[in-house]
Amino acid sequence: MEYSRRSLTILTLILVAALAPAPAFGSAIIGRNVTGATLSIDRQGRAHVSYRSGGRERSVVAWGAINARAPSTHTAQVKFRLRYGLRGGGVCLPYDGPPLAWLLKACKAQDGSYWALQSWVRLKPNYGGTRGAMELHLSHWRGALPALSLYQNWAYGKYRHFFGRLTYRGRGVYGFTATGHGAPLDSYGRNIYVDTFNSRYGKGWHRENSFLTHHRGHTLGDFCYGFFPHFGHPSGQGTKYRATAEGPGVTPVVMWAADDIGAYDATVQQQMQSLERSWGDPKCRA
């Protein structure tokens, strides 16, 4: 790796996502820490969601968006119209679409499109966090899902290094503006949320970090991350990893998971470095 320690520290400061809740531009966050969530689709193609939260029965109707637009500085990303407190109902035809991460409920609509409820903890403290609000996400799509690909290799021969891409229909998923902590400020930006298993943080799953996809170079929607000791915290290298991202627009949440790559392999390292360099991202110069 050609990173210097100073540049890695600066890069980490740029990429760390803010822990405060940021605007939800992807699959709509319907509620937090909910129980008993149900989903049905009416004859008008609207989704009816009911759930219990804060000791109360709640409901919301969603319509007006499907799939996602390609990144643009001129047109906002698609988003649902939501009306809370409106009760109604419909049917949930059997789901026959692709497997989904963090799935609670999925339905096929009469027009052949799909709706899904997914529940996961998006925001946790970096470098070892385990707790946060369980968010309920609603999505609507037809066709292929977003794709989250991730590759492992080594930095300095010993630290774990990740790089990858978030794509939709073959194009990178990325935004144009963000806070200094990496929280998207437009409707296109996306963060990658990485968890590590049985690391020095402790047994089970712990949050390692979260960071933006990039819009530099000729391979857009890419990202990279090194499992170095950060700000007094140990390296988060674990026995396995998972990475989760909200899809663009109102597409579903997607996840990647794999075991740790293991001991250093010079041949694999050369292959992975060549791949990362071919993407041309100045932030990810392997």
Where are these regions (language model features)?
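Extracellular, repeat-based ectodomains that mediate carbohydrate processing or recognition
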Residues: 25-286
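Bacterial N-terminal signal peptides that target proteins for export
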Residues: 1-10
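Bacterial N-terminal signal peptides
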Residues: 9-20
